[in-house]
Amino acid sequence: MKVDELRKAFLNFFEAREHRVIPSASLVPHGDPTLLFTTAGMVQFKPYFMGLETPPASRLTSIQRCFRTTDVEEVGDENHLTLFEMLGNFSVGDYFKSESIDWAWEFLTEVLGINKDRLWATVYIDDDEAYDLWKKKGISEDRILRYTAEQGNYWGPPGDSGPCGPCSELHYDFGTPVIEDENYNPDKDHPAMDTGRFLEIWNLVFMAYYQHEDGTREDLPAANIDTGAGLERLAAVLQGVRSAYETDELRSILKSAEEVTEIAYTPELADQNANGLRVITEHARAFAYLAADGVLPSNEGRGYVLRRLIRRACLLYTSDAADE
């Protein structure tokens, strides 16, 4: 399935389940001083979750362009991205855990046809309800893991304060790790070990709390659902590749980078050239979207981040060219 076909399938699925389709918001958050960039699909919906504004519908769905600065230095490997698209379905006081788990499972296994035996679920350490719901879907107990917040199963807030809640993640099992380790034991491997065997593809956040800057929490006006599935990651699974850069849309940009630099992409060698071409590909795409949303290079704030991307891509390009 091509990336654009995946976009259409997702929106059609949730629109058929009475979700209002909402366009992607700008990468520059509107009226939210706590964030430099739009980092998640729920950002434009924060006022609805907090009870500050009335949503156009209680069920919403979107494909949101997101930008995260935390991964800038990691870009260059097979999967890290600063700019990505987040498939999301949201409930503002409407449905909760049962429906969100039902629909995530249905979309992945029935619409996309992903092998059920390849899916693992993680739940927050004390979330018995989510655990039981995944078990009813047929996931064996050894593939339903209880994780702490430190292991990634508590989401938010997106910024110094805001909505948050425990979450449940779905991971795809490729069957083999990426790392080479003679002591590797597949029976002890699990998603939190970061061996490359597992890829997180969907995060379901049970958003029922508001966290203040001092870390204290209180109940939101209603229990909400905020889910996010990485478009590029899902596309990699569906297209049978391990790298986001091998998916059809990113690969087309990477081919252009090969032509401009006159450097061949050889990921099997895991060399500096492959790393550099991935950086150029990713940062060029991020630059295009940021600039389209009004971000220009400068010495501070958002503009400084953009300038940093340009500098990093140029440095790697000149370094790679010198090696040729």
What are these regions (language model features)?
Residues M1-L306, R311-L316:
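Alpha-helical segments
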Residues Y317-D323:
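Conserved small/polar residues in nucleotide/adenosyl-binding loops
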